[in-house]
């Protein structure tokens, strides 16, 4: 949220990273996203090349979806359909045909359309990467700052600190940085890899002058489209958390507590400037069967960085009522931000500048998808049947505009924006000769031996969807690359079983 407020940028601190706290959703993105990567210089990262790695990790438990030729079974990562469905979700599904879209598996043959969610859920509970993928190293409760150690332009190990003790570990092969889009560039810059002038400003000796921390991207959206539905069942906190639902969740892995953080459906649609024949939608809508009014301001208010004044003016009048939310967002924003060091103290958070709406077109598109959300509620029989109505309260700072007019929606979009916690791109992958890249197509840091980056920071551009599944794909592909580049390695503790039958899967 803006109006001089800071946006929350949560990260997962623990084994499994942000898969410990994400919204569960399993979305691969669009085929054309990866073909664009290849076109931009990321050789070997086209859809045809990455698709097998999605299949390799996947264990899809929904037979209606798992057997359609676009999914894997037998992998480590459990993917299942959300088993809980409210009357709001049924209205959302029925509205799809009224808007001219199909209701489909958005990870299947085509992406454009409305869909029920699939997510990394096993027996109703979160299935993080730490839970999914086996490993032999003992679990450690301590978490530490670490950074690569260098001898000239070669990574030779890692230096890290637990409590007051500094440790050094030397590598026989490579150092692999997987700190994520925020921490990986911070670690590299602290180690002397980054923009020359920025490192000089902080007195850090230069090892490699690379655009580390540039190219920051995230999906941009807003939480400000909320509705009341008198004839529907929403997820009210007072009705959600009770002994019966708790028992059903704990013992059966069923019930409303298994919902994906309240989000039930999503739609991938086209803006007026997008070519629908490409099946490369540029706008997205999440449908959540609740709103910040549903929990009396206990959880969601803080999660989106909402002020007390906004809550009192917009949401308090709807407390205790059946409300729901559309989260519209722009899938491929053109604005680019940066990650920079605040200081040389590794325990101090870096400076994050998402630079939202640097390109005005991003604001135009967000306003357009907000208008589509309003139209869905006001002009579809599916939502009229459940008595869906727009909130009649106005957001502070936009009161001078007519409610839900173009000017009002644009004002709200600009001032109540939030990022969807899908940051990528700060260690961009691509052609080594390209001055905008940090790592090559095999994820090796340019100009530095024995150093790779393996996480979402290497994405050249955002994918058209949530980033959890694509980052897992990157890790699967990277593991093969590392083995190929180190043929003299000792055998790994995890047996590498190829679970891909080449002729089985449709492309």
Predicted regions and their residues:
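N-terminal glycine-rich phosphate/pyrophosphate-binding loop and immediately adjacent elements
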Residues: 1-55, 201, 209-211, 219-228
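Short FAD-binding loop at a beta-strand-to-alpha-helix junction that anchors the flavin cofactor
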Residues: 18, 444-462
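Glycine-rich phosphate/pyrophosphate-binding beta-alpha loops
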Residues: 23-24, 457-469
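Classical protein tyrosine phosphatase
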Residues: 33, 46-52, 91, 95, ...
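Conserved redox-cofactor binding core of oxidoreductases
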Residues: 38-155, 224-242
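Mid-to-C-terminal "cap/lid" subdomains and adjacent gly/pro-rich loops that border
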Residues: 79, 146, 185, 195-320, ...
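Core beta-strand elements of the Rossmann-like FAD/NAD(P) dinucleotide-binding domain
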Residues: 164-178, 182
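FAD-binding beta-loop-beta segment adjacent to the flavin cofactor pocket
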Residues: 328-340, 427-452
């Amino acid at each position: 949220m803006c109006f001089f407020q800071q946006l929350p940028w949560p990260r997962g601190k623990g084994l499994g990273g942000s898969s410990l706290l994400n919204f569960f959703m399993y979305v691969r993105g669009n085929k054309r996203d990866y073909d664009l990567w290849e076109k931009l210089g990321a050789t070997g990262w086209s859809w045809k090349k990455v698709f097998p790695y999605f299949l390799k990790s996947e264990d899809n438990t929904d037979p209606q979806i798992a057997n359609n030729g676009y999914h894997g079974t037998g992998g480590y990562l459990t993917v299942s359909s959300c088993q809980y469905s409210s009357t709001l979700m049924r209205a959302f599904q029925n509205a799809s045909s009224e808007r001219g879209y199909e209701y489909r598996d958005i990870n299947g043959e085509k992406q454009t359309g409305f869909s029920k969610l699939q997510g990394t859920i096993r027996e109703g509970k979160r299935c993080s990467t730490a839970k999914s993928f086996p490993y032999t190293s003992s679990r450690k409760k301590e978490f530490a700052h670490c950074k690569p150690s260098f001898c000239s332009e070669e990574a030779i190990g890692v230096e890290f600190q637990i409590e007051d003790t500094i440790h050094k570990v030397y590598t026989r092969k490579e150092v692999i940085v997987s700190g994520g889009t925020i921490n990986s560039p911070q670690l590299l810059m602290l180690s002397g890899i980054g923009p020359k002038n920025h490192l000089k400003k902080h007195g850090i000796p230069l090892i490699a002058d690379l655009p580390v921390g540039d190219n920051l991207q995230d999906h941009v959206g807003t939480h400000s489209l909320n509705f009341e539905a008198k004839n529907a069942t929403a997820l009210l906190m007072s009705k959600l958390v009770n002994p019966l639902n708790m028992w059903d969740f704990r013992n059966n892995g069923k019930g409303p507590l298994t919902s994906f953080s309240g989000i039930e459906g999503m739609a991938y649609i086209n803006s007026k400037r997008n070519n629908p024949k490409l099946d490369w939608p540029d706008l997205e809508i999440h449908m959540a069967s609740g709103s910040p009014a549903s929990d009396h301001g206990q959880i969601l208010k803080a999660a989106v960085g909402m002020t007390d004044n906004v809550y009192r003016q917009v949401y308090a009048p709807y407390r205790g009522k059946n409300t729901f939310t559309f989260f519209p967002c722009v899938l491929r924003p053109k604005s680019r931000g940066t990650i920079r060091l605040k200081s040389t103290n590794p325990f101090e958070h870096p400076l994050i500048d998402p630079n939202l709406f640097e390109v005005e077109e991003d604001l135009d598109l967000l306003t357009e998808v907000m208008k589509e959300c309003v139209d869905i509620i006001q002009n579809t029989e599916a939502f009229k049947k459940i008595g869906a109505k727009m909130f009649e309260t106005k957001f502070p700072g936009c009161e001078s505009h007519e409610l839900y007019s173009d000017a009002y929606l644009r004002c709200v979009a600009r001032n109540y924006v939030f990022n969807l916690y899908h940051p990528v791109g700060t260690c961009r992958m691509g052609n080594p000769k390209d001055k905008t890249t940090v790592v090559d197509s095999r994820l090796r840091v340019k100009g530095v031996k024995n150093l790779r980056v393996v996480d979402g920071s290497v994405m050249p551009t955002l994918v058209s969807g949530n980033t959890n599944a694509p980052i897992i794909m990157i890790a699967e592909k990277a593991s093969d690359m590392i083995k190929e580049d180190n043929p003299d390695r000792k055998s790994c503790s995890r047996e590498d079983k190829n679970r891909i039958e080449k002729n089985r899967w449709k492309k």
